[in-house]
Amino acid sequence: MALPRRPPTLTRVYLDGPFGIGKTSILNAMPDHTPDGAPILKVYEPMKYWRCQSTDLVVAANETPERRRGGALSRFQSDMIMASIQARFADPYLLFHERLSSKCRGKIEICDTPAIILMLDRHPVAAILCFPITRYLLGEYSLEMLISSIIRLPLESPGCNLTVTILPDEKEHVNRICSRDRPGETADRNMLRTLNAVYASLVDTVKYANLTCPYEKESWEMEWLGLPWFEESLLEEFISRPRPVICSRTRMPLDRTLLAIFKRKELCSENGELLTQYSWILWGLLTKLHTINVELFDISGMSRRECATL
């Protein structure tokens, strides 16, 4: 009697990074099959949902801070609007992630059925973590709303591959944004610089989580106490400091991760220890990231076809 055929193994690859550097173009340039014949299925950004369903979220996200700076909105009003906008950016990703996670087996098995490769334009971490952190560092998003946002990050099933693309060359980044000329987009150099730094730090954060969770909570808490307070003086250092590649088998210093920006007196006791609820939230963030396989991909000077063939 013939044994029942196993379903094909699903390989998930998320392509993420700052906006305007050409992720969608890279996906378009990718073939539909691997050299071995495995199909490559592509899932693009839900741009129609973002821009055509009621409010144009891209325009609103850029206009709201300007309205606050112009006095048309209070800080509280601006924070609430930005939180709502970021939540709506995240909604399609969370919905699809929930559906996809139900199809992912916890264990990768060898089978005679060709693998299916699913290439996705962005992971939920973009709308829930990276863009809110960037807005927070720019003074456009409150710490309270940021904490509320990261609670929504879903637990990741094993087998997630995250490729973070960055473009440190600001001139090239600005040129790419201007050349596509999308309504409502702005080539704000400060935001682009901050967003690239946040994404580079995301890679360090995932690598830290890979070697810390789920068994090193006490060690993490001791490292936390040694972090300096994240005052305004550390902001420029966070954005501009070099980030040399560290071997993935080496434990990443905590101060290279995104968690360092949460060392704020609003979240801690006088001795720097996290208050219990925030400790749960940040440790929960690490446990949600620790199963992700991550790599950093600097696409400076590369064409989209060159990127797609690597």
Swiss-Prot record:
Top class in the EC scheme: transferase
Reaction catalyzed: thymidine + ATP = dTMP + ADP + H(+)
Superkingdom of this protein's organism: Viruses
An annotated Gene Ontology molecular function: thymidine kinase activity
GO process terms (BP): DNA biosynthetic process; TMP biosynthetic process
Residues binding substrate, per UniProt: 86, 182
InterPro entries registered for this protein in UniProt: Herpes_TK (IPR001889), P-loop_NTPase (IPR027417)
Catalytic residue positions: 45
Keyword Nucleotide-binding on entry: yes
Documented EC number(s): 2.7.1.21
Positions contributing to ATP binding: 17-24, 176
Alphabetical UniProt keywords: ATP-binding, DNA synthesis, Early protein, Kinase, Nucleotide-binding, Transferase
HAMAP family, per the entry: HSV_KITH (MF_04029)
Quaternary structure, from the entry: Homodimer.
Family the entry assigns: Belongs to the herpesviridae thymidine kinase family.
Chain's role: Catalyzes the transfer of the gamma-phospho group of ATP to thymidine to generate dTMP in the salvage pathway of pyrimidine synthesis. The dTMP serves as a substrate for DNA polymerase during viral DNA replication. Allows the virus to be reactivated and to grow in non-proliferative cells lacking a high concentration of phosphorylated nucleic acid precursors.
Name of the protein in its database record: Thymidine kinase
